[in-house]
Amino acid sequence: MAVDNNKAKQAYDNQTGVNEKEQEQRQEQQNQQPEFTNKLSFSDEVIEKIAGIAAREVSGILEMKGGFVDNISSSFGSNNNVSQGVSVEVGEKQAAVDLKVVLEYGESAPKIFRKVTDLVKEQVKYITGLDVVEVNMRVEDVMTKKEWSQKNEKSQSSNNEDKGLQ
Protein backbone atom coordinates (compact mmCIF):
# COMPACT_ATOMS: atom_id res chain seq x y z
CA MET A 1 0.00 0.00 0.00
CA ALA A 2 1.54 3.32 -1.07
CA VAL A 3 1.38 6.29 1.30
CA ASP A 4 1.02 9.76 -0.15
CA ASN A 5 3.41 11.97 1.84
CA ASN A 6 1.69 15.19 0.80
CA LYS A 7 -1.67 13.98 2.06
CA ALA A 8 -0.10 12.83 5.33
CA LYS A 9 1.63 16.18 5.82
CA GLN A 10 -1.52 18.09 4.98
CA ALA A 11 -3.52 16.00 7.40
CA TYR A 12 -0.92 16.64 10.13
CA ASP A 13 -0.88 20.38 9.43
CA ASN A 14 -4.67 20.51 9.55
CA GLN A 15 -4.62 18.60 12.82
CA THR A 16 -2.05 20.88 14.48
CA GLY A 17 -3.36 24.07 12.89
CA VAL A 18 -0.06 24.83 11.13
CA ASN A 19 -0.18 26.06 7.59
CA GLU A 20 3.06 26.91 5.79
CA LYS A 21 1.52 29.87 4.01
CA GLU A 22 0.20 31.30 7.28
CA GLN A 23 3.60 30.82 8.86
CA GLU A 24 5.30 32.63 5.96
CA GLN A 25 2.79 35.49 6.18
CA ARG A 26 3.40 35.89 9.93
CA GLN A 27 7.15 35.95 9.31
CA GLU A 28 6.76 38.62 6.61
CA GLN A 29 4.64 40.79 8.94
CA GLN A 30 7.27 40.55 11.65
CA ASN A 31 9.95 41.57 9.16
CA GLN A 32 7.89 44.55 7.94
CA GLN A 33 7.32 46.07 11.39
CA PRO A 34 9.72 48.93 12.06
CA GLU A 35 12.63 47.95 14.23
CA PHE A 36 13.26 50.04 17.35
CA THR A 37 16.57 51.87 17.24
CA ASN A 38 18.20 54.26 19.66
CA LYS A 39 21.47 56.12 19.86
CA LEU A 40 23.40 57.97 22.54
CA SER A 41 25.94 60.47 21.26
CA PHE A 42 28.08 63.24 22.72
CA SER A 43 29.32 66.52 21.31
CA ASP A 44 33.05 67.13 21.19
CA GLU A 45 32.61 69.87 23.80
CA VAL A 46 31.26 67.39 26.36
CA ILE A 47 34.26 65.09 25.97
CA GLU A 48 36.58 68.12 26.11
CA LYS A 49 35.03 69.20 29.42
CA ILE A 50 35.30 65.72 30.95
CA ALA A 51 38.93 65.38 29.87
CA GLY A 52 39.77 68.92 31.02
CA ILE A 53 38.26 68.44 34.47
CA ALA A 54 39.98 65.07 34.86
CA ALA A 55 43.38 66.42 33.78
CA ARG A 56 43.15 69.35 36.20
CA GLU A 57 42.62 66.92 39.09
CA VAL A 58 46.12 65.48 38.64
CA SER A 59 48.74 66.94 40.95
CA GLY A 60 51.56 68.58 39.00
CA ILE A 61 49.32 70.12 36.33
CA LEU A 62 49.30 73.85 37.02
CA GLU A 63 47.15 74.90 34.11
CA MET A 64 45.79 73.89 30.74
CA LYS A 65 46.99 76.05 27.85
CA GLY A 66 44.53 77.02 25.18
CA GLY A 67 44.99 78.27 21.70
CA PHE A 68 44.61 81.80 20.40
CA VAL A 69 40.84 82.04 21.01
CA ASP A 70 41.15 80.68 24.56
CA ASN A 71 43.92 83.15 25.33
CA ILE A 72 41.81 86.07 24.09
CA SER A 73 38.77 84.99 26.13
CA SER A 74 40.89 84.53 29.26
CA SER A 75 42.28 88.04 28.82
CA PHE A 76 38.69 89.29 29.19
CA GLY A 77 38.34 87.52 32.50
CA SER A 78 36.65 84.28 31.51
CA ASN A 79 39.50 81.97 32.40
CA ASN A 80 37.29 79.32 33.99
CA ASN A 81 36.86 77.42 30.73
CA VAL A 82 37.34 73.78 31.77
CA SER A 83 37.89 72.65 28.20
CA GLN A 84 40.76 75.10 27.63
CA GLY A 85 43.83 73.25 26.37
CA VAL A 86 41.79 70.22 25.33
CA SER A 87 40.84 69.07 21.86
CA VAL A 88 39.16 65.81 20.96
CA GLU A 89 38.02 63.67 18.09
CA VAL A 90 34.89 61.71 18.90
CA GLY A 91 33.55 58.72 17.01
CA GLU A 92 30.54 56.52 17.74
CA LYS A 93 32.36 54.31 20.23
CA GLN A 94 35.81 55.86 20.66
CA ALA A 95 37.51 59.16 21.38
CA ALA A 96 41.00 60.62 21.06
CA VAL A 97 42.16 63.40 23.38
CA ASP A 98 44.91 66.03 22.96
CA LEU A 99 46.00 68.11 25.97
CA LYS A 100 48.23 71.19 26.28
CA VAL A 101 49.48 71.71 29.82
CA VAL A 102 51.77 73.71 32.09
CA LEU A 103 53.64 71.42 34.48
CA GLU A 104 54.87 72.22 37.93
CA TYR A 105 58.67 72.41 38.05
CA GLY A 106 60.24 69.42 39.80
CA GLU A 107 57.44 66.99 38.89
CA SER A 108 57.94 63.95 36.67
CA ALA A 109 56.28 64.50 33.30
CA PRO A 110 56.07 60.74 32.50
CA LYS A 111 54.37 60.01 35.87
CA ILE A 112 51.95 62.88 35.44
CA PHE A 113 51.24 61.75 31.88
CA ARG A 114 50.38 58.23 33.09
CA LYS A 115 48.08 59.61 35.80
CA VAL A 116 46.38 61.99 33.38
CA THR A 117 45.95 59.25 30.78
CA ASP A 118 44.47 56.82 33.30
CA LEU A 119 42.10 59.38 34.80
CA VAL A 120 40.92 60.77 31.45
CA LYS A 121 40.27 57.27 30.10
CA GLU A 122 38.46 56.25 33.29
CA GLN A 123 36.23 59.33 33.49
CA VAL A 124 35.33 59.43 29.79
CA LYS A 125 34.49 55.71 29.85
CA TYR A 126 32.43 56.01 33.05
CA ILE A 127 30.47 59.09 32.02
CA THR A 128 29.96 58.35 28.32
CA GLY A 129 30.79 54.70 27.69
CA LEU A 130 33.28 55.76 25.01
CA ASP A 131 36.69 54.12 24.88
CA VAL A 132 39.56 56.59 24.82
CA VAL A 133 41.98 55.09 22.31
CA GLU A 134 44.55 57.88 22.33
CA VAL A 135 45.73 60.53 24.78
CA ASN A 136 48.41 63.00 23.72
CA MET A 137 49.81 65.54 26.16
CA ARG A 138 52.00 68.44 25.06
CA VAL A 139 53.89 70.30 27.77
CA GLU A 140 53.71 73.97 26.80
CA ASP A 141 55.58 75.35 29.82
CA VAL A 142 57.15 74.43 33.17
CA MET A 143 56.77 76.78 36.14
CA THR A 144 57.29 76.76 39.88
CA LYS A 145 54.10 77.15 41.89
CA LYS A 146 55.35 80.56 43.01
CA GLU A 147 55.92 81.76 39.41
CA TRP A 148 52.52 80.45 38.41
CA SER A 149 50.76 82.14 41.35
CA GLN A 150 52.48 85.46 40.61
CA LYS A 151 51.53 85.23 36.94
CA ASN A 152 47.89 84.55 37.84
CA GLU A 153 47.80 87.39 40.39
CA LYS A 154 49.13 89.81 37.78
CA SER A 155 46.64 88.71 35.14
CA GLN A 156 43.72 88.87 37.59
CA SER A 157 44.66 92.34 38.84
CA SER A 158 45.02 93.63 35.27
CA ASN A 159 41.62 92.09 34.40
CA ASN A 160 40.07 93.80 37.44
CA GLU A 161 41.67 97.14 36.45
CA ASP A 162 40.33 96.74 32.92
CA LYS A 163 36.85 96.26 34.37
CA GLY A 164 37.26 99.17 36.79
CA LEU A 165 37.05 96.90 39.83
CA GLN A 166 40.23 97.98 41.60
From Swiss-Prot:
Record region (Disordered): 1-40, 144-166
Biological role: May play a key role in alkaline pH tolerance.
Family as reported in the entry's similarity comment: Belongs to the asp23 family.
Pfam families: Asp23
Name of the protein in its database record: Alkaline shock protein 23
Species the sequence originates in: Staphylococcus saprophyticus subsp. saprophyticus (strain ATCC 15305 / DSM 20229 / NCIMB 8711 / NCTC 7292 / S-41)
